């Protein structure tokens, strides 16, 4: 945590708020997630964070879209609390016995460490070029700002004044949902959402491929082989897709390849 504060400076607190809310949401939604991932050693621990965001975020979106509630921080907190309460109730009354992977808590610990470190490193890297410039970044940021100002969905189109969005905005919406839920600012969470996705793109493939290798190899496989396979999967999804400039801009240039 000390290293995170040193790397991120004033952005550290927003980063920690997001990381903590993700941890809490994942914990609360384990009764549901464990039922889906009951064949996994970690009971889908890291997937629980994503499932929580999807369920709570979709709940807020649908109720706002049909004009039952306004899209505010208060409504986001209330609906998230109700969804979380439903998950806890399911765990208590749904005869779900194996909710937490007590026998594999070391695995859960290391998955959390991996998620935190990758999330931190991507956030630190994003700080070198945080501007919403290039490709669709300006539009993404504009959509998010529009939704932050609005209490209805879809929000007013920043390109076509007086009209609502006539474009898919799911990714931007979930970013704003988490922003309103945590009481943070789009100026920071615009990049934080991108780096969070990159962190999930590492740890989710890690969990999945590690489990696949363990199931495939059985007792023939050593612990380090399944873990190494999971790490390779995480690197392939989260890192390799961002190597275009390094490969084409640097390596090919050094090798004289055009």
Please describe what each predicted stretch is:
Residues 1-106:
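Membrane-embedded, hydrophobic transmembrane alpha-helices
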Residues 12, 16, 20, 106-113, ...:
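Active-site lumenal/periplasmic loops and adjacent helix-entry segments of GT-C-fold
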């Amino acid at each position: 945590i000390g290293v995170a504060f040193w790397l991120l400076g004033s952005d550290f607190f927003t980063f920690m708020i997001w990381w903590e809310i993700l941890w809490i949401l994942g914990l609360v939604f384990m009764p549901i997630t464990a039922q889906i991932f009951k064949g996994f050693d970690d009971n889908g621990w890291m997937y629980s964070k994503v499932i929580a965001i999807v369920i709570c975020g979709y709940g807020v979106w649908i109720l706002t879209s049909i004009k039952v509630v306004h899209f505010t921080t208060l409504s986001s907190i209330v609906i998230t609390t109700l969804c979380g309460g439903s998950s806890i109730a399911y765990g208590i009354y749904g005869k779900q016995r194996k909710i937490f992977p007590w026998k594999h808590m070391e695995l859960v610990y290391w998955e959390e460490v991996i998620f935190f470190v990758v999330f931190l490193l991507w956030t630190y890297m994003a700080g070198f070029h945080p501007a919403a410039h290039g490709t669709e970044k300006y539009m993404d940021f504009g959509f998010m700002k529009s939704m932050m100002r609005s209490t209805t969905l879809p929000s007013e189109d920043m390109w076509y004044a007086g009209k609502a969005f006539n474009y898919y905005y799911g990714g931007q919406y979930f970013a704003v949902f988490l922003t309103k839920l945590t009481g943070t600012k789009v100026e920071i969470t615009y990049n934080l959402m991108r780096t969070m996705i990159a962190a999930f793109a590492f740890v989710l493939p890690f969990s999945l491929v590690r489990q696949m290798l363990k199931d495939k190899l059985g007792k023939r496989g050593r612990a380090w082989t399944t873990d190494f396979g999971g790490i390779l999967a995480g690197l392939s999804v989260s890192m390799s897709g961002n190597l275009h400039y390094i490969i084409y801009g640097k390596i090919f240039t050094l090798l004289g390849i055009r």
